[in-house]
Amino acid sequence: MTLVPMVVEQTSRGERAYDIYSRLLKERIIFITGPIEDQMASLIVAQLIFLESENPEKEICMYINSPGGVVTAGLSIYDTMQYIKPKVSTLCLGQAASMGSLLLAAGEPGMRYALPNSRIMIHQPSGGFQGQATDIEIHAKEILDIKGRLNDIYVKHTGRDLSEVVANMERDNFMRAEKAKDFGIIDKVIEKRLDIGVE
């Protein structure tokens, strides 16, 4: 059982209690923590759309600490990040692996960050199927199609050649924050909040 801290604020109407994530959402901060799956992705998408409706001009900050997860769930978050009007900055704390690294790279150019001890990992998608031979063949074609789409997304956001992306994603490829910057997944490694926007 996970305990979520509560924050109590004084208002003109008295005290108001929020769970910590709801309070941070008021500051336009969204957390992606843990495995990416459908229910979690729906909550993230809803938060992005809600914050756009609140103020379509104001930046949204996305903090990522995720081992990755379901590709289609992650792509629903990715597509929403690209779809909405506000700029979405991304920050890796802990790890951004697999689909987590794709979301990290998908932040607004110039606004993709990682803390110094973050770990970023990219790789090709994986899947396991059983059943009739024809069904296995269908699923194999689907996963190859998804692999191609993910490669294209990394090419778009890193500026790397397709051949470079394919070679780097052949197996689990772990990177320190500085290497992720060199690869183009992030724009800057930051140690303090004040470092954001400072060159």
From Swiss-Prot:
It is found in: Cytoplasm. InterPro entries: ClpP (IPR001907), ClpP/crotonase-like_dom_sf (IPR029045), ClpP/TepA (IPR023562), ClpP_His_AS (IPR033135), ClpP_Ser_AS (IPR018215). It is an enzyme of class 3 (hydrolase). Keywords: Cytoplasm, Hydrolase, Protease, Serine protease. CDD domains: S14_ClpP_2. GO terms for biological process: protein quality control for misfolded or incompletely synthesized proteins. Its main location: cytoplasm. Its EC number is 3.4.21.92. GO terms for molecular function: ATP-dependent peptidase activity; ATPase binding; serine-type endopeptidase activity. Cleaves peptides in various proteins in a process that requires ATP hydrolysis. Has a chymotrypsin-like activity. Plays a major role in the degradation of misfolded proteins. GO terms for cellular component: cytoplasm; endopeptidase Clp complex. The active site is at S98 (nucleophile), H123. Belongs to the peptidase S14 family. PROSITE patterns: CLP_PROTEASE_HIS, CLP_PROTEASE_SER. It catalyses: Hydrolysis of proteins to small peptides in the presence of ATP and magnesium. alpha-casein is the usual test substrate. In the absence of ATP, only oligopeptides shorter than five residues are hydrolyzed (such as succinyl-Leu-Tyr-|-NHMec, and Leu-Tyr-Leu-|-Tyr-Trp, in which cleavage of the -Tyr-|-Leu- and -Tyr-|-Trp bonds also occurs). Fourteen ClpP subunits assemble into 2 heptameric rings which stack back to back to give a disk-like structure with a central cavity, resembling the structure of eukaryotic proteasomes. This is ATP-dependent Clp protease proteolytic subunit.
